[in-house]
């Protein structure tokens, strides 16, 4: 009788253990499933971020292309303004400036060069710098194999006699202009963007 009772207890224990194993997943299986789910979530987020970056890059490239075409057309029409937000002096000193008051503007045979700094005095142009106006001659445009546009010209007038070199790279309206005075070595470089005249919002001070 005792042996029968012990046998029944053993059988019941085996049945209970089997039932528990069938109805509850093991911790290892749970962790594996959770890990795979997390991995899929992370991979999904990375894929979305990559797709978003690609979309943003493509949109920016389209915008840059439009701006570049506008700038190139304006340069060919000799009707543009380079609005600068940085001025680099002869020995590499840099001044960050307001693009509304620092520019080189060309309108057919006339050019205006203006610089204005954040200083406590008005200067000759009344806004902290100098504004000069002159006639354009020797206007030339060259585009190399890489699509870089180089514009060269001479500007002569009251207070200015200089060679001007403008460089604009393929696919962007970002540009720089080097101003090389004919009677001194005080070279000046302005970095900014080229805009058609009708889109430029510069403020002109008093000319010399």
Predicted regions: what they are:
Residues 19-74:
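Sec-dependent signal peptide cleavage junction
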Residues 23-34, 138-208:
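Helix-rich interaction surfaces within compact, conserved domain-sized segments
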Residues 66-67, 84-99:
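N-terminal post-signal-peptidase region of extra-cytosolic proteins
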Residues 71, 102, 164-166:
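Residue-level detector of beta-strand structural context in well-folded domains
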Residues 82, 111-115, 175-179:
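Short hydrophobic/aromatic-rich beta-strand segments that constitute the beta-sheet cores
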Residues 94-147:
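Mid-length scaffold segments of soluble, non-membrane domains
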């Amino acid at each position: 009788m005792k042996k029968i009772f012990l046998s029944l207890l053993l059988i019941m224990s085996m049945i209970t253990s089997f039932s528990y194993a069938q109805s509850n997943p093991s911790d290892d299986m749970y962790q594996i499933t959770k890990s795979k789910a997390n991995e899929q979530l992370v991979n999904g987020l990375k894929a979305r971020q990559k797709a978003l970056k690609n979309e943003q890059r493509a949109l920016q490239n389209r915008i840059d292309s439009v701006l570049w075409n506008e700038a190139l057309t304006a340069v060919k029409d000799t009707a543009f303004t380079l609005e600068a937000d940085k001025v680099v002096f002869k020995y590499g000193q840099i001044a960050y400036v307001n693009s509304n008051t620092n520019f080189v503007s060309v309108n057919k045979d006339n050019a205006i060069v203006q610089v204005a700094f954040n200083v406590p005095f008005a200067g000759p142009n009344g806004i902290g710098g100098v504004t000069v106006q002159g006639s354009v001659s020797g206007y030339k445009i060259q585009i190399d194999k890489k699509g870089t546009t180089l514009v060269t010209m001479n500007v002569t007038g009251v207070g200015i006699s200089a060679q001007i070199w403008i460089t604009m790279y393929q696919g962007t309206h970002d540009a720089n202009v080097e101003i090389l005075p004919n009677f001194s070595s005080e070279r000046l470089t302005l970095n900014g963007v080229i805009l058609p005249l009708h889109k430029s919002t510069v403020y002109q001070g008093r000319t010399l």
